Amino acid sequence: MTKKEQALIEQYAKSLVQVCQERDTLEALQADVLAILEVFKATNLAKTLSSLAVPRAKKLELVRQLQGDNIIYLNNFLEVMLQNEREAYLYQVLLRVLSELASVSNQYDVTVTSAVPLSEEQKQRVRTVVSKRLAVKTGRLIEKVDPSLIGGFMISVNNKVIDTSIRRQLQAFKMNLK
């Protein structure tokens, strides 16, 4: 992706988030964007919208089906993207909208990788640790299981990592022995 395309995607995303922030509809925007992204993940929609082989009329129909019960600002935004023939960038723009929302609200997705699945109590403790140590609000808690950690966990938030895994401790111990 070129710098020009990245700037275009960023500008569209920032504009939508700014409008929704002014209208105090950020939570509704986030819910609607997540729902649309689920459609993208469940289908080949991103490839279809960026394909030159698919007629423009079909692309318009597909994007208009996404509008549904979304907040008016998102539906208007989708129309603007169609009018400007930017539907090929829709998936990347929506992903960027989520990162802009996280930045504006200081609420980030937290990825927790552990050797075994976490209990609800442990998930709550992770949220507390993240808010205290990293000074961010917890968005979605994304849980991954990786038995190679042996024990402990890794928390990743906004490009920051807390690694208390036994695997890392063993690696550090090995390095100290050299």
Curated annotation (Swiss-Prot):
It comes from the Bacteria. Gene3D superfamilies: N-terminal domain of the delta subunit of the F1F0-ATP synthase (1.10.520.20). Signal peptide: none annotated. InterPro entries: ATP_synth_OSCP/delta_N_sf, ATPase_OSCP/dsu. It is found in: Cell membrane. GO terms for cellular component: plasma membrane; proton-transporting ATP synthase complex. The keyword Transport applies. It holds the Pfam family OSCP. The keyword ATP-binding does not apply. Keywords: ATP synthesis, Cell membrane, CF(1), Hydrogen ion transport, Ion transport, Membrane, Transport. It is a peripheral membrane protein. One of its GO terms (molecular function) is proton-transporting ATP synthase activity, rotational mechanism. NCBIfam families: ATP_synt_delta, PRK05758.2-1. F-type ATPases have 2 components, F(1) - the catalytic core - and F(0) - the membrane proton channel. F(1) has five subunits: alpha(3), beta(3), gamma(1), delta(1), epsilon(1). F(0) has three main subunits: a(1), b(2) and c(10-14). The alpha and beta chains form an alternating ring which encloses part of the gamma chain. F(1) is attached to F(0) by a central stalk formed by the gamma and epsilon chains, while a peripheral stalk is formed by the delta and b chains. F(1)F(0) ATP synthase produces ATP from ADP in the presence of a proton or sodium gradient. F-type ATPases consist of two structural domains, F(1) containing the extramembraneous catalytic core and F(0) containing the membrane proton channel, linked together by a central stalk and a peripheral stalk. During catalysis, ATP synthesis in the catalytic domain of F(1) is coupled via a rotary mechanism of the central stalk subunits to proton translocation. Belongs to the ATPase delta chain family. This is ATP synthase subunit delta. The gene is atpH.
